[in-house]
Amino acid sequence: MALSKAEILDAIAGMTVLELSELIKEMEEKFGVSAAAVAVAAPAGGAAAGEGAAAVEEQTEFDVILTAAGANKVNTIKVVRAITGLGLKEAKDLVDGAPKPVKEGVAKAEAESVKAQLVEAGAEAEIK
């Protein structure tokens, strides 16, 4: 007897996250596919359409740039170490060499969080 789509969905809804992860792995192996997200390409158009699409396209990766260490350089170094996982000397060199990127290619929410942490420590930072 074949299961209906509704029965399959109900069974999946009752699974734990671990069970779902294992199910996905087994499906990938059985069907020879990958569950990785696929980027959808924009439709090709004339030059004017391409320029319009580029202007509307939202930036998805951001860089957080430390522009100045601020008055309390020690706190800034501590925050940079916490954010980047760098050693003391590397974090100090980064802070002393400002403006320098602290995090590159991160999501907007993470970039804003990193900037807020740096500003809270007394540093100046910007998101590009």
UniProtKB/Swiss-Prot annotation:
GO terms for biological process: translation. PANTHER family: 39S RIBOSOMAL PROTEIN L12 (PTHR45987), LARGE RIBOSOMAL SUBUNIT PROTEIN BL12M (PTHR45987:SF4). GO terms for molecular function: mRNA binding; structural constituent of ribosome. It comes from the Bacteria. The lineage of its organism: Bacteria, Pseudomonadati, Pseudomonadota, Acidithiobacillia, Acidithiobacillales. Gene3D superfamilies: 3.30.1390.10, Single helix bin. Forms part of the ribosomal stalk which helps the ribosome interact with GTP-bound translation factors. Is thus essential for accurate translation. GO terms for cellular component: cytosolic large ribosomal subunit. It comes from Acidithiobacillus ferrooxidans (strain ATCC 23270 / DSM 14882 / CIP 104768 / NCIMB 8455). This is Large ribosomal subunit protein bL12.
